């Protein structure tokens, strides 16, 4: 549940069709949609078929000079990504831009200070009147203690300047949960994150039950967040999330629609803050292994989205 109590210099934009905030599950379920990859589907087609209202829009990167652009090359406003946002909002939904990802030039690395990074985040927040942002910190960016601390400090500034905004951090994990480096830095610095979201795939799960492996990793995440922040179990669950990968993963793991049902049941019982996946571009059937446009497993179009769209928080 969110509130909009921003300062006078902010530009908040309500979704078309009213100003009532979404239910607890609506913002929590925002599958990744990537305009730079994999024949991106029409968001309204997915919305109409599944009931999902929100998308996590990938990826905001740096153009090389700490300046945010979509994929580091498409314009921040006025291009295909703004068209997508306008389309989703006109249909009664909204978006959560995701900063980072696996590849490309990351703002978190290219910006020279926390202040510059916070200003880059703010530029995107102001451009679209955002209610939430996702920091997808992976690869070399995650591995750098300097970049981790810069990101934490920048997000503290974003929180101070944008009351009510949701801050999600998405990062990799092992089968027993993630390491505690970034979570510990955030807790020690006084940064509260609405959802620490793990990506429980590409972690050696080929030939194993990925639904059960996901739950094991999520329990490890809960324990790490609980320890760092001094939360109760219930508080920790409510500050964590899962971002799965549908179908055949990059490392040959298989995540089925039934695995998504298992994950959904876990999330419902524990009231996770976020339940998402990579990606709606791939939520289409094909055989012979996953690709950027399909899952590689037996399914009907948008089956994975339909499962997570049932999440109510």
Question: Can you say where each PLM-predicted feature lies in the sequence?
Answer:
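N-terminal low-complexity, Pro/Thr-rich disordered segments
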Residues: 15-24, 313
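Short, low-complexity, polybasic intrinsically disordered segments
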Residues: 256-274
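Lectin-like carbohydrate-binding module/patch detector with strong preference for beta-trefoil
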Residues: 1-19
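Chitinase-like catalytic core of GlcNAc-active glycosidases
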Residues: 23-231, 235-261, 281, 285-311
């Amino acid at each position: 549940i969110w509130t909009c109590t921003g300062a006078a210099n902010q530009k908040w934009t309500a979704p078309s069709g009213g100003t009532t905030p979404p239910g607890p599950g609506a913002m929590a379920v925002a599958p990744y949609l990537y305009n730079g990859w994999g024949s991106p589907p029409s968001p309204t087609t997915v919305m109409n078929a599944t009931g999902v209202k929100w998308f996590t829009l990938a990826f905001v990167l740096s153009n090389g000079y700490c300046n945010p652009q979509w994929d580091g090359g498409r314009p921040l406003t006025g291009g295909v990504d703004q068209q997508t946002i306008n389309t989703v909002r006109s249909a009664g939904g909204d978006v959560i831009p995701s900063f980072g990802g696996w590849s490309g030039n990351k703002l978190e690395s290219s910006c020279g200070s926390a202040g510059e990074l916070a200003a880059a985040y703010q530029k995107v927040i102001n451009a679209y009147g955002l209610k939430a942002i996702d920091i997808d910190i992976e690869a070399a960016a995650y591995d750098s203690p300097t970049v981790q601390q810069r990101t934490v400090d920048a997000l503290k500034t974003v929180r101070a300047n944008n009351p009510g905004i949701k801050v999600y951090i998405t990062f990799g994990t092992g089968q027993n949960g993630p390491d505690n480096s970034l979570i510990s830095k955030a807790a020690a610095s006084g940064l509260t994150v609405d959802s620490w979201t793990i990506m429980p795939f590409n972690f050696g799960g080929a030939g194993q039950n990925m639904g059960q492996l996901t739950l094991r990793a999520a329990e490890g995440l809960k324990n790490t967040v609980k320890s760092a922040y001094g939360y109760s179990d219930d508080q920790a669950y409510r500050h964590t999330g899962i971002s799965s990968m549908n179908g055949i993963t990059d490392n040959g793991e298989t995540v089925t629609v039934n695995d998504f049902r298992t994950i959904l049941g876990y999330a419902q019982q524990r009231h996770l803050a976020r339940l998402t996946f990579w990606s709606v571009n791939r939520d289409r059937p094909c055989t012979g292994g996953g690709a950027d446009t399909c899952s590689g497993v037996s399914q009907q179009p948008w089956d994975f989205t339909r499962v997570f769209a049932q999440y109510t928080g």
